[in-house]
Structures are given as structure tokens and as C-alpha cells.
Amino acid sequence: MLKFGLACEGVTDQAVIENILCGFYKDKNLKSEIKAFQPLFDATQQKQLEGEFGGWEILLKFLSTKRFRQEVINNQYMIIQIDTDISEHPNFNVSQHNLSVEELIEKVVERLILEIDSKKEFYSKYKERIIFAISVHSLECWLLPLYKSSKNGKISGCFETLQRESKKIKVIKDYKTYEKLSHDFLKYKKLINIASKNSSFQAFINRLPKKI
């Protein structure tokens, strides 16, 4: 049984979550105990497995499958990551109107639970194993404080801002780049400090079990 399974929108998100977990638990070798199940990842090539597809709609479909339920049972924890920038799409249907970051996170979590239980009631029995990483409005907003200081956590336009502010690393959407961009998350104190600058990042950190 592995420590963590990952169900994310894409491989860039997987790279960041892996570094967060290694930093939070102060164990760089923890990566060997983490496996990406959506999208499946080719560790040798460090890219999405050939024929695999990412994206939020594919992620939603995965959450309702027997394979997802089996992987939750077979792993100590399953982390589900999704950005909220798509929440108002008709196929997701979570309004952002007049919601705080915390309220939006809860609405998105409720929507994901509906998907998990859409074919078979499952969540209530295994909820202690399922951890939600809801990035408002994109995971780049979690990375941004590493490259640009700000009193208020930015929640929109983060990818474009990250591209401008990252001077040493060219920001392109692949695994290796995001592994480098999030490298400082391997340092526990740095991780905790950066998470405190973004409400949705802090919410994810708060959901992580203290010991594994």
C-alpha cells in the first residue's frame, strides 16, 4: 500500500503536490510512496503516459469509476486536485458569485463528492482517506508567492504573472518545469510560510494528516 495516490487535472499539478507532500512530511524520499492515477504518469520519461489525457472533465469521469474506488481502497490516502477557474462551466456548475475562498472550496468539494457517489455510494465510508486540494483559481496561485511578494494572496491571472516573475525558470506547462518551480516547497519552513499567504493553499495544508 502506497502512502498517497494522486488524482489531478494534469502532470504539472502532480509535480507540485509531490513536492508539497515531501516538504510537509520532511521526507524527500516520500516521492517513492506517491503514485499518480489520473492522469497516469510515465516516471521514466517524466511526462503524461502515452494515450492518457488530463483536464478537469477527464478527472470528473475518473472519480466515478470503479478504478478510482479501488485505488482509494488500495492506498493510504488519495488526493484530489482541481482548479476553481472552471467551476462555473455548465458541466461543473458551481457559481463563484458572492462566495469567499473558503465557501467556494466547500462548494467545489461538495460537487466532487457528488461525482464520487454518482454510480455507487462510496465517499462516506472512505472519506478519511480522501484529501481535497482545491486551488483557487489555479495551482499557479500557490507557486506565485515564491516569485513575487504580496500581502494579499492573488487568485486570478496567476499563470501569466508567474511567467513574468520567474526570471530563472521559463514557465511552460510540463512536469519538469513545475517540479523546478515548486522545489522550495521541499523546505518545510518555506512551505508553511508560503501556504500562509494563500487561503486555498493553507486549506489544503490543514487537510493533510499530521502523521502518515
What are these regions (language model features)?
Residues 6-10, 17:
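A sequence-level detector for short glycine-anchored, His/Arg-bearing signature motifs
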Residues 14-50, 57-212:
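C-terminal accessory helical subdomains adjacent to catalytic cores in phosphodiester-
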Residues 1-5:
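Extreme N-terminal starter segment of soluble prokaryotic enzymes
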